[in-house]
């Protein structure tokens, strides 16, 4: 039997407040609920899902580094770090693990400073504006790409 593919889910700053923080923009589901649903679907798809949420850029960078040789795909919602973090971009490029960038809200329909991403041009894909479903779509796409490789 072949080894299960491993997918790393990373969530950036303030996503620990999902369900409480601006539900009109980010929805009413908590991050724990989103991760539980995603973990269940990952199990059904026959892949392993690991998760880290951090409000600290260096913790996300460190986990990306640890993923090298251990993880097959990354799904990342960098949150506010989308618009500021060259460090996360460089870490993702450095480990050369394919990734999909996810945003709950449509960042292009919001304030102008949210329109730029340091990650989008090096991501396999970007999903935004579809709420918590965006994570499910990213998981399905990641599994599809891993199986096609």
From Swiss-Prot:
Protein name listed in UniProt: 3-dehydroquinate dehydratase
Coiled-coil spans in chain: none
Quaternary state and interactors: Homododecamer.
A Pfam family recorded for this sequence: DHquinase_II
Site features described as Transition state stabilizer, chain residue numbers: 21
Location of the active site: 26, 103
Catalyzed reactions: 3-dehydroquinate = 3-dehydroshikimate + H2O
Annotated source species: Aeromonas hydrophila subsp. hydrophila (strain ATCC 7966 / DSM 30187 / BCRC 13018 / CCUG 14551 / JCM 1027 / KCTC 2358 / NCIMB 9240 / NCTC 8049)
Residues where substrate binds: 77, 83, 90, 104-105, 114
Similarity comment: Belongs to the type-II 3-dehydroquinase family.
GO molecular function, one term: 3-dehydroquinate dehydratase activity
């Amino acid at each position: 039997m072949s080894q299960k593919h491993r997918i790393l889910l990373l969530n950036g700053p303030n996503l620990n407040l999902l369900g409480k923080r601006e539900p009109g923009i980010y929805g009413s589901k908590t991050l724990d609920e989103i991760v539980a649903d995603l973990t269940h679907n990952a199990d059904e798809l026959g892949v392993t899902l690991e998760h880290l949420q951090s409000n600290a850029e260096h913790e996300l960078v460190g986990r990306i580094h640890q993923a090298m040789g251990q993880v097959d795909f990354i799904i990342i919602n960098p949150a506010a770090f989308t618009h500021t973090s060259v460090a996360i971009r460089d870490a993702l490029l450095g480990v050369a693990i394919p990734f999909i960038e996810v945003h709950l809200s449509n960042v292009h329909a919001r304030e102008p400073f949210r329109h730029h991403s340091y990650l989008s041009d090096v991501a396999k894909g970007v999903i935004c504006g579809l709420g918590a479903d965006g994570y499910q779509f990213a998981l399905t796409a990641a599994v599809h790409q891993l199986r096609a490789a």
